[in-house]
Amino acid sequence: MDGLHTELALGLIGCCGGDGQQQTAPFVAKTYQMVCDPRTDALVRWGRDNNSFVVVDPAAFSQLLLPCFFKHGNFSSFVRQLNTYGFRKVHPDRWEFAHESFLRGQTHLLPRIVRRKKRGEGGGGGGGASCSFGGGAGEHQVAAAAASVGMSGEEEDAAEDVLAKEAALFEEVQRLRHEQTAIGEELARMSQRLQATERRPDQLMSFLAKLADDPNAVTGHLLEQAAERKRRRQHLPSHEPTVCPLPPAPPPQPPQPLLALAGAAAMDGTYWWTTEHHHHHHHQMKPMTVLPSLEPPTASCGVHQVPELGGGGVMGLTTDGEAKVEPPFPFCLLGQAFF
């Protein structure tokens, strides 16, 4: 792990050698490492006399630092472990802990910090704190330390429970503070939205009053705003897809002439009408005038009865040789018509 203290990297957590040297407990070694690392002084640091350490920000300490060294981020569990190893809280208003063997730069004293045995484990101890050091000298030192503070085993257990409960309450208070902050921010946002909603009817009524008093001024103001928005859109790069212009529409088709009725033949652009003389039994071709269509090709058109030519005749178009007949109203207004 990066950032290990030099003394810890050199073997702060050692194994028992042949001379019976004890090893430092992993919890104690990791705690010493956290306190000694200058990069974590904003969260935890040494006390004024270098014989204690202070957790400056327990909430950030639990969230950022504890998970890097331990398998949890529970501050109350960390405090409970400190109590198990004989640390005590030395200041009522801040999280400052001390141990007689937890001193800055005195790494050779760390193996003396061991987990205390529960009551009933081990045979000695009398009224003192029952801790095991693996040697008579260590037991004597622990007993002397317990006697110096004047605490029995039951009192130490009670103090441990009180500190654990205090740490748990502190964590709960921190959680409630975070929730309160989040709720306050949400209420502020809702208040802003509510105020904006309440202002809209007043703005609408004011606009309607101005429109009723001077419609031209309001219309001119709206036109100015629209022109300003248009100028802004022209200056800003457009993110809308480019629309290709449509091709021009084809020119309209010229009107189609009426098709000749049955019996007419087209020659050199002039329709010819066939008349039949019943008496002489021969055919005669006369030219017919072609009139452009005045209505769409789908519309129906009428024809006029052509007088009999030489004793007989059929329905057809007007010939050039005959006098033009005046068409009825309203066709006479068009200048030319079907008849």
Curated annotation (Swiss-Prot):
Principal place of residence: nucleus
A molecular function (GO) term: DNA-binding transcription factor activity
Keyword list, A-Z: Coiled coil, DNA-binding, Nucleus, Phosphoprotein, Stress response, Transcription, Transcription regulation
Gene Ontology CC: nucleus
Region ranges (Disordered): 227-248
Post-translational modifications reported in the UniProt record: Exhibits temperature-dependent phosphorylation.
Transmembrane segments: none
Region (Hydrophobic repeat HR-A/B) location: 176-212
Motif (Nuclear localization signal): 229-233
Main function: Transcriptional regulator that specifically binds DNA of heat shock promoter elements (HSE).
Record's subunit section: Homotrimer.
Protein name: Heat stress transcription factor C-1a
Protein's organism: Oryza sativa subsp. japonica
Gene behind this protein: HSFC1A
